[in-house]
Amino acid sequence: KSFVSSNLAISLSLLGKKVVIVGLDIRKPGLNKVFHLSNKEKGITQYLSNPETDLMELVQPSDINKNLFILPGGAVPPNPTELLARNGLDKAIEILKQNFDYVIMDTAPIGMVTDTLLIGRVADLSVYVCRADYTHKAEYTLINELAIEKKLSKLCTVINGVDLKKRKYGYYYGYGKYGKYYGYGKR
């Protein structure tokens, strides 16, 4: 999930959009590793613990692109769920929306903790990331339930880690055996 959210943020920034990626997997922050950030104490948990903190001072520029910024998770708090349930998260996302074209939130996996469902209230769109040949089929039932019950806004699914060499269709370019039926390759 951090791979997908990071690449989405980078792609949008390369299109000239001002993007911030927010590390909201505050129990197991991963953005510091992805973006090689040195200051692991600065982050959104500081703001959520004390909304008087200047949120924009916690946002760090990226060395990848001038349009890409990172708001890491920060120090792991003793009460992550409580912090995410507070109105401070709503206020933080509003501030970020006023300052950036896109706010991408990297969250904890669903099912492990309730954090992601709490964060869902401030998202305009939710992306459930599955890994090919790894995600259990039962989780797809959970995705359907989340969509039907509208627990996450505009729920989409991304499947990554697809080994195209193992797939029967869609790997090779061309018309294959179907081309002959339409006259392709005839002179």
Question: What residue ranges belong to the model's regions?
Answer:
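P-loop NTP-binding module
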Residues: 1-187
